[in-house]
Structure formats: C-alpha cells, structure tokens
C-alpha cells in the first residue's frame, strides 16, 4: 500500500531541513571527502513537519524510521572508508622508516661490493706481478743456461761457431716471440680487467642513481 503525500507542500516545508542537512554535510567533509563529524538525524522535527503536512502519527513515524535507518546506514558505510590524520601520519612514518632501512641496506651492500671489488683487483694485480716475476726468472735462467752452453760449445767446437750462432738466433727469436706473446696476453688481461672493473662500477652507479630517484 502506497502513501499519498502532497509532494509540493511537503517539499516546501522540508526545504529548510534538507538545506540545513546539506550545509552540515559540506562543512563536515574532510580531506578525503568523508565526514569528520556525524550530525544526528532530527527525527522529532521530521515527524512534526510530517504531521503539519497532514500525515497521521503512524505514517509519520514509519517514514521517520525509514529515513533515519537509511541515513544511519549511509553514515556507517562512509565512516568505514574514512582515514584519520593519525593513520595517515602512521603510514607516512612507516614509509620513511622503510626508505631509511632500504637506503641503509643499499649503502651496506655498496660498501661490501666495493671492498670485495678492491680486494679482487688487488689480488689480480698481485697475481700478474707474481706471474711476471716468475716468467722473468725462468727467462733469465733459460737465457743464462743457453749462453753458458753456447760458450762451452764455442770453446770445444770452434768450427761449429756458425751453427751455434744460428741456434742462438733461433733461441733469441723464440724468446722474442714468447715475450711478444706474453705482452699481448698481458695487455689483453689488463683490458679485460679494466672492462670488468668499469662494468661493476657502472652497475653500482646505476643502482645508486636508481635509489636516489626512488628516494626523490
């Protein structure tokens, strides 16, 4: 069964009430568009306005309960999505703590990587110097032995001077070839080492730049 309510007269009588509710609603909006303060529904005034409009008490109370329930449900749903200033501050503080922790971890990782890189580079240079010293000693020993043998052969076999001289030249050529190969390998090794170091430094710089952009 539907209620027959004179729409025009009720609207003009309810207009101050609805206008007051609208003002309260606008004033109570927060930063996120939710109510900061709940203004209760004026049920007594609503019933009186209905009665003045010619509606009996039972129908007035029924309409009052329906509108009050709708108003309360709407306020509860809006309140569920509201966020307080304290919650926003807590989230912002937690984000700052997380960023500080992340920055500390990145700095610690960077320091560890730099220390490890420095240690590896020093170890590589130490290995290269040790190889150079060992090869130089072996080369000197080989050259000394070869020259000693050549001198003995020259004393014992003066007629084989030309042959021994040829052997000496061949040995010198082999030594030069080995030295040239060693220099080539050493240059290649240095180039690879510098490329590896540059790649690590570039990667660390890119990681640090990404972190700075994330912080900013």
Swiss-Prot record:
GO cellular component: mitochondrial inner membrane; mitochondrion
Stored InterPro entries: CCDC90-like
Topology relative to the membrane: Single-pass membrane protein
GO BP of this protein: calcium import into the mitochondrion; mitochondrial cytochrome c oxidase assembly
Principal subcellular localization: mitochondrion
Coiled-coil region: 111-133
Subcellular location: Mitochondrion; Membrane
Entry's transmembrane regions: 193-215
Domain of life: Eukaryota
Pfam families noted in UniProt: CCDC90-like (PF07798)
Keyword terms of this UniProt record: Coiled coil, Membrane, Mitochondrion, Transit peptide, Transmembrane, Transmembrane helix
PANTHER family, per the entry: PROTEIN FMP32, MITOCHONDRIAL
Family label: Belongs to the CCDC90 family.
Name of the protein this chain belongs to: Protein fmp32, mitochondrial
């Amino acid at each position: 069964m539907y209620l027959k309510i004179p729409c025009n007269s009720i609207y003009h009588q309810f207009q101050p009430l609805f206008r007051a509710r609208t003002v309260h609603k606008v004033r109570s909006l927060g930063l996120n568009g939710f109510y900061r303060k709940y203004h209760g529904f004026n049920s007594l005034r609503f019933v009186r306005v209905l009665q003045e409009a010619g509606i009996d008490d039972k129908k007035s109370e029924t309409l009052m309960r329906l509108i009050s329930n709708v108003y309360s449900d709407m306020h509860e749903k809006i309140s569920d999505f509201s966020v307080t200033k304290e919650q926003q501050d807590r989230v912002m503080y937690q984000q700052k703590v997380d960023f500080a922790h992340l920055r500390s971890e990145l700095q610690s990782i960077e320091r560890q990587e730099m220390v490890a890189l420095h240690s590896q580079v020093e170890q590589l240079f130490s290995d290269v110097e040790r190889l150079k010293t060992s090869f130089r000693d072996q080369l000197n020993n080989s050259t000394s032995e070869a020259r000693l043998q050549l001198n003995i052969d020259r004393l014992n076999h003066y007629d084989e001077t030309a042959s021994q001289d040829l052997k000496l030249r061949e040995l010198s050529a082999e030594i030069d070839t080995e030295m040239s190969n060693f220099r080539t390998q050493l240059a290649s090794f240095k180039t690879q080492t510098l490329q590896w170091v540059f790649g690590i430094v570039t990667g660390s710089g890119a990681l640090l730049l990404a972190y700075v952009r994330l912080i900013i």
